[in-house]
A protein has these predicted regions:
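Short, function-defining helix-loop hinge/capping sites that tune catalysis or transport
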Residues: 87, 145, 151, 232, ...
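His/Asp/Glu-rich metal-coordinating catalytic cores
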Residues: 9
C-alpha cells in the first residue's frame, strides 16, 4: 500500500469505475490497481475495452497472480520495484513477472533513493530504454523546506536532503522533480541524452496514446518544451508554445496550504533511522 492509509484504499468495483469515468468525462487515461484483489479481473478488462491504460500498482501479487493480471490487460508496472512484491529465487513476485513479460512497460523512479542505482541499471537492461517510463513519484511536498508536515492524510517528515518519510521509516512518495531523475539517468547512470529523452518523453507519450501530438519535437505537434542548461537546471518551460516558466520569473512554486507542523530539529527524533 506504500504510504497510503488503509482507509483510503478501494477494492476494484466496476460500478465505481464507471462512475469515475463518467466524472472524468474522457480525461481518464491511466488507472492503477493490484491484480490480486477480488474484482480486479472485471475492472481491468473493462478498462482495456475503454482503451484506458492499466498498471499493476501497490501490489502483493505473487508471480501467478501477476501473470493473470497481465493476461487480463495490465501493460505497465507502476513505480517498478516500489510497493511491489519483490523477487525471491522461489517466488519471482510481481517485480519478476513485470520484468519478464514483454507485453509490459516499466515505470522507474530515478531519484536513486527509491531504487538503488545498480537496480535501476538492471531494470533498464532487462526491459531496454524503449520500454522504460521515467517518473518522479513527486507529492505535494516537492520543493518545501525540511520539517514535519501533514500530507497523504498523516504526518510525514521531509529531511534536509528532501526525502519524505513516515514515522515507521516508510518512504512517502518523492520530493524530487522530473529533471532530477532525468539528470541522474545521464550523469549518474551514464545513459545518453537520446536514451534519457526516450524514457522521459517518448515512451510515456506512447503509452498515454498522445504520441501523435506530444513526446517529440516535430512539425504539427504541441510545442511542449523544456529548456535546460549544461547542469540540467530548467531555464524555460513552454506548454503548447506558450512560455509558462522562466528562471527569471522568481515565482514561489511551493503550495501555500502546506504548513510545517514542527521543524526538522523538533521532529527528527520521532522518526526511525533519524532520516
Amino acid at each position: 500500500k506504500g504510504a497510503f492509509k488503509v482507509e483510503y484504499l478501494l477494492k476494484p468495483s466496476l460500478e465505481l469505475m464507471e462512475e469515475f469515468l463518467k466524472i472524468g468525462n474522457g480525461h481518464v487515461i491511466h488507472v492503477s490497481m493490484a491484480p490480486e484483489l477480488e474484482g480486479a479481473e472485471e475492472v481491468i478488462k473493462y478498462l482495456v475495452y475503454k482503451n484506458i491504460l492499466v498498471s499493476g500498482a501497490h501490489t502483493n501479487a505473487n508471480i501467478a497472480q501477476t501473470k493473470k493480471g497481465i493476461d487480463w490487460g495490465i501493460r505497465l508496472s507502476n513505480h517498478t520495484g516500489n510497493a511491489q512484491r519483490s523477487i525471491h529465487h522461489r517466488e519471482p513476485g510481481a517485480l519478476g513477472g513485470y520484468l519478464l513479460d514483454e507485453r509490459v512497460d516499466c515505470e522507474l523512479i530515478c531519484d536513486l533513493y527509491h531504487i538503488h542505482p545498480d537496480m535501476a541499471k538492471l531494470i533498464i537492461k532487462i526491459k531496454s530504454v524503449d520500454r522504460i517510463c521515467l517518473i518522479s513519484d513527486s507529492i505535494e511536498a516537492t520543493g518545501i523546506k525540511p520539517g514535519e508536515y501533514n500530507f497523504l492524510g498523516r504526518m510525514a517528515l521531509v529531511d534536509e536532503d528532501g526525502w519524505s518519510k513516515l514515522p515507521d521509516g516508510t518512504i512517502a512518495g518523492s520530493t524530487k522533480d522530473m529533471i532530477y531523475g532525468f539528470r541522474n539517468l545521464v550523469k549518474e547512470l551514464n545513459f545518453s541524452m537520446e536514451d534519457a529523452i526516450k524514457m522521459a518523453c517518448v515512451n510515456p507519450a506512447r503509452l498515454s496514446n498522445v504520441l501523435d501530438s506530444k513526446g517529440t519535437i516535430e512539425v504539427n505537434k504541441d510545442a511542449d518544451l523544456v529548456v535546460i542548461d549544461d547542469e540540467f537546471n530548467v531555464m524555460y518551460t513552454f506548454v503548447e508554445g506558450k512560455l509558462e516558466y522562466s528562471k527569471d520569473f522568481n515565482y514561489d512554486y511551493c503550495n501555500p496550504k502546506i504548513i510545517p507542523v514542527r521543524t526538522m530539529k523538533e521532529a527528527r527524533g520521532d522518526y526511525i533511522g533519524q532520516c
